[in-house]
Amino acid sequence: MLIDWFTVIAELVNFLILVWLLKRFLYEPVLKAIDEREKKIASELQHAADVEKEAESRLIELQRKNEAFDNAHAQMIKDAEQEAVEEKRTLLNEAHREYDALRMRLQETLKHEETSLESRVTGRISAEVFSIARKVLQDLSGSSLEAQIADVFCQRLRESDPEDVAAMKDAVSRKSLNPLVRSTFPLSSSLQERIQAVVRDVFSIDTQLRFEEGDDMVGGIELSMNGHSVSWSVRSYLDSLEKMTAELLEGAE
């Protein structure tokens, strides 16, 4: 079968365009918002520094006045100095507390925005990767992405470690609930039957499997039995792609 290089190249171009759009319309607005927050915090810190400077100026002024009345008002001078020291300490402590609070809020905000951004980027990349992979697989072999993932998962089951196989058998014998198969996408009846047959052959389990869908698998399938599981997903590949995308964006800045 001939490879449609035009389709493959077109999909790669679409992916590069997506990366550029993410940088242009997602990363830049976030960075701009972070920069504005940093400017606001810097302004508030400058205000705190001005307050501290004003307190020190007031202390100097009080000391200068106290020296003029030192002979006649020794006790008054002492009280005024003590008041100035306490006021300075209070202002400094307040400024430090405000600085620490602002720094903590900034760190929490940056962490939250970074996590949110990573989640959105990962979701977009995942969707595009699946779209491209599905089209490429169909062009190359005429098979669906879901079938390919199911085949890889079945192969993973066949290659299970003997100790894991024994643990899974024991888990099923001690659990009345049927084993669960979770996947990102709905499995057709033929794919369910194929997985059922492999599980029966590998684990010698003559029981009906339960099938559910879940978004947390990120393009994969998992078989779980009473705390034991065997799974395969494209999470690791997406992590590598995400790292490569981040490096690409950093190099473009």
Curated annotation (Swiss-Prot):
Disulfide bonds: none annotated. It is found in: Cell inner membrane. GO terms for cellular component: plasma membrane; proton-transporting ATP synthase complex. It holds the Pfam family ATP-synt_B. Keywords: ATP synthesis, Cell inner membrane, Cell membrane, CF(0), Hydrogen ion transport, Ion transport, Membrane, Transmembrane, Transmembrane helix, Transport. One of its GO terms (molecular function) is proton-transporting ATPase activity, rotational mechanism. The chain crosses the membrane at residues 2-22. It comes from the Bacteria. It is a single-pass membrane protein. F-type ATPases have 2 components, F(1) - the catalytic core - and F(0) - the membrane proton channel. F(1) has five subunits: alpha(3), beta(3), gamma(1), delta(1), epsilon(1). F(0) has four main subunits: a(1), b(2) and c(10-14). The alpha and beta chains form an alternating ring which encloses part of the gamma chain. F(1) is attached to F(0) by a central stalk formed by the gamma and epsilon chains, while a peripheral stalk is formed by the delta and b chains. NCBIfam families: alt_F1F0_F0_B. Belongs to the ATPase B chain family. F(1)F(0) ATP synthase produces ATP from ADP in the presence of a proton or sodium gradient. F-type ATPases consist of two structural domains, F(1) containing the extramembraneous catalytic core and F(0) containing the membrane proton channel, linked together by a central stalk and a peripheral stalk. During catalysis, ATP synthesis in the catalytic domain of F(1) is coupled via a rotary mechanism of the central stalk subunits to proton translocation. This is ATP synthase subunit b 1. It comes from Prosthecochloris aestuarii (strain DSM 271 / SK 413). The lineage of its organism: Bacteria, Pseudomonadati, Chlorobiota, Chlorobiia, Chlorobiales.
